[in-house]
């Protein structure tokens, strides 16, 4: 199982759209799981689904009933086309309380108890142990924009990684600037038929040939 981390220190860069398109493209040939690790994902509205549970419950089972963890995970897993996804955290407070070790344990249990080939991690700054999770990833994609503020933030992020002894994270990171894309469909299941999907295909071609 390989972990693919999608992260950006800037906002409004199509990070989640990129992550979901990547997962949908890979799921045509592989078994893929998408995990949203943001404070507020908005996926419930975008998917027009009323999630009956969320990641907080899965973390609870991870700590208190590990023998039933895979069962509970399977019962709450949803889909976008062929891409599996876990219901994201509903509460920001629940999300930020998850420790780095709990994230690592979650990934280990998924690898041990499922046949997923790839996990797409849609990452954010609020995660405990962000840099260590990025280090754990087999591939990292960082998205940016072409304006001066965005370029400066990416450069600062690079410098912080290097000064914090996470230079290995930067070395395996591929940076892409998403072009301006208009009229993305409201339905996430339609993203693979967009200009964005063609761009993502170009970005990942050499990594997944």
Regions from the language model: what does each represent?
Residues 2-39:
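Walker A/P-loop phosphate-binding motif and the immediately C-terminal alpha-helix
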Residues 4, 33-35, 84-86, 139-141, ...:
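Hydrophobic/aromatic beta-strand patches that form the interior of the parallel beta-sheet core
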Residues 6-7, 35-36, 87-88, 120-122, ...:
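Conserved beta-strand segments of the P-loop GTPase G domain that flank and frequently precede/overlap
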Residues 8-10, 37-111:
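P-loop/Walker-type NTP enzyme "switch/lid" segment
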Residues 15-16, 95-99, 149-156:
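Active-site-adjacent loop/helix micro-motif of nuclease/hydrolase catalytic cores
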Residues 105-192:
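Conserved catalytic-core segment of NTP-binding enzymes
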Residues 186-209:
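NTP-binding/hydrolysis catalytic cores, primarily Walker-type P-loop NTPases
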């Amino acid at each position: 199982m390989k972990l693919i981390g999608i992260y950006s220190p800037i906002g409004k860069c199509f990070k989640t759209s990129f992550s979901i398109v990547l997962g949908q493209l890979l799921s045509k040939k592989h078994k893929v799981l998408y995990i949203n690790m943001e404070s507020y994902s908005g996926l419930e509205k975008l998917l027009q689904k009323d999630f009956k549970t969320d990641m907080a419950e899965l973390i609870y089972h991870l700590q208190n009933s590990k023998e039933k963890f895979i069962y509970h995970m399977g019962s709450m897993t949803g889909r976008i086309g062929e891409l599996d996804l876990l219901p994201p955290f509903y509460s920001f407070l629940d999300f930020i309380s998850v420790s780095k070790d709990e994230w690592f344990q979650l990934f280990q249990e998924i690898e041990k108890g499922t046949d997923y080939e790839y996990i797409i991690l849609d990452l954010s700054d609020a995660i405990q142990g962000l840099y260590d999770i990025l280090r754990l990833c087999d591939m990292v994609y960082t998205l940016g924009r072409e304006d001066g503020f965005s370029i400066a933030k990416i450069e600062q992020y690079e410098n912080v990684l290097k000064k914090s002894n996470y230079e290995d994270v930067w070395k395996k990171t591929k940076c892409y600037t998403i072009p301006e894309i208009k009229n993305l469909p409201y339905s996430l299941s339609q993203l693979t038929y967009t200009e964005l999907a063609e761009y993502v295909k170009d970005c990942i071609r050499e990594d997944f040939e």
